[in-house]
Amino acid sequence: MNQTVSITENFDGVSIDHLKTLPAGVKFITEDGHGVQDNATMAKAFAICTQKDITVMSHAEDMEISPWDYRLAEDIETVRNCWLSEYYQTKLHMCHVSTRGALDAIQMAKLRGAPVTCEVTPHHLWFDDSRLQYKVNPPIRKADDVAALVTAIKDGTVSCIGTDHAPHSAEDKAKGAAGMVGLETAFAVCYTKLCRMEGLPLEMLSFLMSSGPAQVLGLDEHKGRLVPGFDADIVLVDTDHMFTVHADELHSKSKNCPYDGESFYGQVMMTIKGGKVTYQKDRQ
């Protein structure tokens, strides 16, 4: 069992005493969609996690900076957390990295020996801020940030792709909730963008969406590969078939889909979980 616990108790931003008594089954801590703002608190949390072999998962956002510059807010907190990872040799996973500056910090930290991994999302690869103004956190970035994400995938800086799937209801979106659905479209978006448009080998995309996440989560002894003895978790796709996304046909409880009306290659035809078919698309 792999459980995640908040970095600070009840997300209060300062209390970390609970980390000292976490059971062995807890392998990750995260403040979810927030960054811990206090430097000393975060440093102490990193020190504890090194002792207990816990990975820190970080949404990087300096809340004092974000009201006037979202990009700088991500960059600054990414730099801080990477330095803490290097100093304490704490395993750090940077979630939904979206800026060139954050990637630069991660690359430099890795070169210095910091145990840092990172992920990017399909929507930060597909959209830039000239094409979509959609409330999501981190925000949709500039075209040069998107190009940097693609480069970081190709050079191995990026460890995996994560959907950051956020199925908010229409009512919650109307109230300003940040996020979008992206689970059902994730492979097609990434395959079309990375493989069809950017020339990424399909084998590398498969790694980023299977073995890569399994390694980050410490599940790679039984998930992420098609070999005897591993869990039979399989996705079958038609890489030659182009299809159009229709939000009203999604299975998610939410329809807040920014890809509505867009066409992609790589339609998912079947999913198998633990050897059992959990989804099968009807052929038209």
Where are these predicted regions, by residue range?
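Histidine/acidic residue-rich metal-binding segments in metalloenzymes
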Residues: 14-161
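Short glycine/proline- and charge-enriched loop/turn segments
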Residues: 130-136, 171-175, 250-255
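C-terminal cap of metal-dependent C-N hydrolases
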Residues: 228-283
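Metal-cofactor-binding active-site regions of metalloenzymes
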Residues: 1-14
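Short, positively charged
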Residues: 139-141, 203-204, 246-252
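Fold-independent oxyanion-binding glycine-rich loops
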Residues: 4-7, 32-33, 59-61, 97, ...
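His/Asp/Glu-enriched, well-ordered alpha-helical/loop segment
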Residues: 72-91, 154-155, 159-161, 166-239
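A structural connector/turn signal
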Residues: 148, 221-224, 267
